[in-house]
Amino acid sequence: MKRIQREVTFSIAQIDAYADASGDHNPIHRDGDFARSVGLPGVIAHGLLQMGILASVASEAAGGAGRLRRIYCRFAGMVEPGDTVTFAAEDAGPGKLMLTAVNQRGDAVLTKASAEYR
């Protein structure tokens, strides 16, 4: 199996759309002043938005969403608007994928990421 990867540059519009679709209107995802008041650099992308993109890449690598059985990851870093993250999946043995999500600075934003498929 070849390596599958997708590069995504996060935008305020994308983060807002995810907030509306998911119902997660936590102000750290929508209000820069609030986010800074709690020690964040500003608005950050939802972890589950990132995981959803990673799951999409894993599904493609597994041969379709119906083949994906499990996906694991740890939310390890913040993604801010303007950050570009490369999400990737590659073979890790029969029915297993190693997954990565790395920003433009080379920092892993999702770690301990893997998937199982049938």
Where are these regions (language model features)?
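Catalytic strand-loop segment that frames the active site of acyl-thioester-processing enzymes
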Residues: 1-43
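Homeobox/homeodomain signature
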Residues: 5-8, 18, 24, 34, ...
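Hydrophobic beta-strand-centered segment that forms part of the acyl-chain substrate-binding groove
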Residues: 37-45, 49-96
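HotDog/MaoC-like acyl-thioester-processing domains
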Residues: 1-6, 79-118
